[in-house]
Every structure is written in C-alpha cells, then in structure tokens.
Amino acid sequence: MLNNRQHFLLGVMLTSLSVILYKEFTYTLPIIKTETIVHMVNDPIIRGNFELEANEINSSLNKSKLKHLLIYTNALCDEYGVDYEMVKAVIQTESSWNHKAVSTSGAIGLMQVLPETAMSEFNTRKNDLFDPYINVTVGIKYLSHLNNHFDDMESTLTAYSHGPTVTRKYSSNYIKNNFYVKRVYKNL
C-alpha cells in the first residue's frame, strides 16, 4: 500500500514520464520502461539514495527536480549501456550542473550539447536543449553512439569534447593525457 508521499512522488514521476513520452513522439526521445522508473520511485532504498545524491550536488535545479532527473538519467544509462557515474562526471565537467549553461562555442545545457549535433544526430531543436531531460537524453545517446565507435572511454570522452573526426587524428598518448579526460576522471 502506498502512503501519501509515495502517491505524490509516483504522480510527479508519471507526469514527468508523460511529458517525456510526448516528447518521444515529437522529438524521438527514448521510451524508458515505466516499470523501471516506478520501481525506482517506490523503492525507499533506491529513492533515498537518489535523495542523498541530489543533496550532494550543487545544481541550478531544485533538489526535487534534480532527484527525478537523476532517476531518469540512471534509467536512461541502463537503457543505452552508458556508465551512470561517468555521465554525472561529464555533467559536472561540462556545466557544473547548470541546466542554463551556454559555452562560448554555443554548446547548451547540462551536457553542453552542440545544437548542430542535436539536430543532425537526434532531430532535436536548439531551444529544447535547455530542458534538462532532453539535454541529458541527447548527451547520453551521443555518448552511447561514440562508445560504439571508439575502443576505450578516453577516446569516447575526447570525441565527446573535441568531435569524432578530430579525435581519430590524435595519438593515443594525447587522448589518455588530454585535459578534458583528466577533468572528467577527477569528477568521478
């Protein structure tokens, strides 16, 4: 039997999920199994872990929204075979958890996704990248795509930051020792 707080959290998650599913239809975002998210919301140990995690992160998002985003991110990482801790380290490195961040090169949001990449690879519009759920979805899908094209995590991270074409030209010594990769690993 669910208590009032669990009903509320489930309602919030299902509302968020319905928005995500709507965006799936219009923006080709992935559909995450409802049971996965409902299980994460209903399991007090899992929910508590995400609450603790959210409290430890200094973010532009409020703690409740951040907790829900972490649950979503974790489920999405499972769906795409991307390491959840690595994604959090990329977010910390790229934007320090500021969902409104815009870089000098025009990259947007938590995972600092370039609008050109979002549009060409995932049919996602520039302004949609300010939505943390869309931004994280595109970032994780892109990391998964890069992971399938490179042999190791250092090359994948370098490609995420510098682009896949440029990364293929770098020596393995540069890739393992570049500043971006070191910063991401420091944030693990």
Please give the residue ranges for each predicted region.
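N-terminal Sec-pathway targeting helices
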Residues: 1-14
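Residue-level recognition of hydrophobic positions within alpha-helical transmembrane segments
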Residues: 2-3, 20, 90, 131
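Hydrophobic alpha-helical membrane-insertion segments, chiefly the h-region
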Residues: 15-25
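Catalytic glycan-binding domains that act on GlcNAc-containing polysaccharides
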Residues: 27-188
